């Protein structure tokens, strides 16, 4: 028998990164759309900030954001500042609802894939970045790999173009 003196034992038993927490909340959007059903082929978001069919629901460090591939506090700060400014814009313009479209979410997903394909990250087939640690989870590279500075510029351009890709009412 071997004995090891330890101060701490950390059991890393796996987790459903980026989507698990949201899916487990059993969120229902417009027309009784269930988030788990909507993401059955993989997560779709616009900028990792919003999900088509789920108005007024913002996500922070969600799939499609740079989150886990950058300094998390910095990514969270960028997301929160952007969302705060967006809500201020809504209040100033008397908007009660914000959503995005399926089309813009799909287009953003293509940009996420293009950024990832410039790296080796998607080639690691057993990575949690792809959801490979969860049985039957669709294999989709979830974080935006273009870097936080590029992502921030994209968000700024969208804001400066009247929140292109977002629909207000």
Which sequence ranges carry the predicted segments?
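Short hydrophobic core segments
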Residues: 4-16
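Short amphipathic alpha-helical surface micro-motifs
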Residues: 8-10, 37-43, 109-112
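Short amphipathic beta-strand/extended segments with alternating polar/hydrophobic composition
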Residues: 5-7, 38-39, 140-143
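Glycine-rich loop(s) and the adjacent beta-strand/alpha-helix scaffold that form part
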Residues: 16-65
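C-terminal, flexible cofactor-proximal segment of oxidoreductases
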Residues: 45, 58-169
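Structural alpha-helical scaffold elements that stabilize or flank donor/cofactor-binding regions
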Residues: 2-3, 50
């Amino acid at each position: 028998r071997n004995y090891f003196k330890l101060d701490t034992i950390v059991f890393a038993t796996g987790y459903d990164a980026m989507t698990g927490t949201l899916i487990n909340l059993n969120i229902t959007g417009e027309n009784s759309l269930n988030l788990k059903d909507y993401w059955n082929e993989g997560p779709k978001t616009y900028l990792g900030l919003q999900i088509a069919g789920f108005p007024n629901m913002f996500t922070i460090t969600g799939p499609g954001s740079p989150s886990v591939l950058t300094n998390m506090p910095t990514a969270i700060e960028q997301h929160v500042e952007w969302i705060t400014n967006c809500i201020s814009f809504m209040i100033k313009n008397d908007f009660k609802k914000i959503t995005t479209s399926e089309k813009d979410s799909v287009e953003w997903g293509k940009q996420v894939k293009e950024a990832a394909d410039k790296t080796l990250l998607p080639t690691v087939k057993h990575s949690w970045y792809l959801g490979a640690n969860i049985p039957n989870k669709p294999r989709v590279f979830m974080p935006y790999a273009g870097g936080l500075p590029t992502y921030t510029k994209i968000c700024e351009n969208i804001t400066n173009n009247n929140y292109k890709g977002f629909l207000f009412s």
